[in-house]
Amino acid sequence: MARSRSATKISPQVRPFQVADARQILNRDAPEQDPVFTMQQADAGPAFTAWVGDRPIGCAGVVMAWPGVGMAWMTVSQEIAAHGLWLTRITRAFLRDIIRANGLHRLEAVVLDDNTRNQQWLSVMGFVWEGGVAHGYLPDKRAVRRYELVEGMSTWPM
């Protein structure tokens, strides 16, 4: 007897972040990404991991740069695309909690200059492109676009 599609579908879950979660994603889906830099970022503030079954599919967090300012980061696997709406809702709730708990007035995020999918997602999340390209920004000298989300903006999540 064949199983129905809904009976076999596994919904994502959120768990507290563990450094090993990001390591699994990087080893599996992003071998070109600098694991040391990612681990330092991931261990420097509140973070969560999205899981489907026994596999992490994404990690996200906020590094507290200085009082009132956070730097948002995210590392995702290719599997995350199937859960985009869920991820957006969970991440918005996470950012609201972090903003409230830490008294933030500004969030920043960077995305690779050639990654239009993630640029569009940051826009959906309410971040606004600051304009221009920051060349040589990452440890491996890749260029990024900087995005901001500032208290008082119409997209501020509070």
Residue ranges and their predicted role:
Residues 30-47:
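Active-site rim helix/loop that mediates acceptor-substrate recognition in acyltransferases
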Residues 2-26:
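A short beta-loop-alpha structural element at the N-terminal edge
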Residues 68-87:
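Conserved acetyl-CoA binding element of GNAT-fold acetyltransferases
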Residues 83-99, 120, 124:
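Conserved acetyl-CoA-binding loop-helix of GNAT-fold acetyltransferases
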Residues 104-123, 136-137:
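Conserved beta-strand-loop-alpha-helix junction that forms the acyl-donor binding cleft
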Residues 110, 128-144:
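Conserved catalytic-core motifs of GNAT/GCN5-like acyltransferases
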